[in-house]
Amino acid sequence: MKLETQAIHAGFNDDPTTRAVAVPIYQTTSYSFRDTQHGADLFDLKEPGNIYTRIMNPTNDVLEQRVAAMEGGIAALCMASGMAAITAAIQTVAAAGDNIVSVSQLYGGTYNLFAHTFPQQGIEVRMASGDDIAALEALIDDNTKALFCESIGNPAGNVVDLKALSDMAHKHGVPVIVDNTVATPYLCRPFEHGADIVVHSLTKYIGGHGTTVGGAIVDSGKFPWKDNPRFPRFNQPDPSYHGVVYAEAMGEAAFIGRARVVPLRNMGAALAPLNAFMLLQGLETLALRMDRHVENAQKVAEYLNAHEQVSWVNYAGLKDNKHYEVAQRMVAGKPSAILSFGIKTGAEGGAKFIDALQLIKRLVNIGDAKSLACHPATTTHRQLNEDEMKTAGVSTDLVRLSIGIEHVDDIIADIEQALAAAK
């Protein structure tokens, strides 16, 4: 099936009992066992099946199958938020004493997790620019457990050369984890460029309407965990789960299996089935919405780029952008709908611009059907110091726009009057 069809049909074909066409909401905590042996087999991972909604749920399962199909993966795991998905993905491969290498241009919450929370737990995170493959490679050592990046950076708008990054990481036997939230599988499928694991904030474009928080991890099933000395957690017995060896018990699904039964089970960041249902509704129209998002964003970027009050515009759809050529290869020249710009009067002008907006909403979400604006230095990246913000690709004058699917004339009209107010 094509991606547009997978978004509507993958993972579900009428309820077997009621023949209902809509995916049911299984609002339950638990599932009964046929007998004692059935329960034991489920807990020993000898048989697939439902145990407890903190670990799995039939509504969530449909969403997981659908997202996995769209990304071209073998399986997915849905979680309570995108940050939960990123945290669990790292915890699946790394522990105290290990390190990961990350592209520095990151969403503020991820940067904070990497710069402060993980180091407090004994996991070191080393960063370099996504534009400098050699610098990233120099950070890898025997204790490196993953290389992390965002396919399209938020809010920096950088587009990462996933093929070059993956080739370099695999040369050292390191898996690549890609946050594909901004691009979505409609614009970019990281597995096709060599990535091993994908994470999503489903809250954004996949949900699409600013109603529901959720996250997902998708496993390509291609990374060689078995007999890999860098990853004993996958090829040696796990004492916390009756000595199971994930690479043997789960084969190519070793990563996503361990993610489910270790960080999700033990940390508890489960996605509620009602949220899964809401996210499924958004997912069905992803392709249609992304076409409009990208079309509108390109026109807004071109408008801003020609405006006398604007000092710079960062959108990889503009030919003078340094990531334009990479965007042609990674996202077929459609770099989603997050753009940033600066006003010649600096941070003060940016604040006046945001305060003057009437149609565009002032808030920190992205990927909504509605157009949104924020000032990252005082919101999403506020916890970062000046050097950290610079590393993450955020300047004090940066205004981030998440362009929605309204008529583009109305979006530009609101930007025009707000710029006039910012003089």
Model-based region annotation:
Residues 1-57, 65-66:
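N-terminal "arm"/small-domain region of PLP-dependent enzymes with the aminotransferase-like
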Residues 35-87, 109-117:
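Conserved N-terminal alpha-helix of the aminotransferase class I/II PLP-enzyme fold
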Residues 72, 143, 309-312, 359, ...:
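Glycine-centered tight turns that cap/initiate beta-strands
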Residues 115, 124-125, 142, 289, ...:
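PLP-dependent enzyme catalytic core of the Aspartate aminotransferase-like
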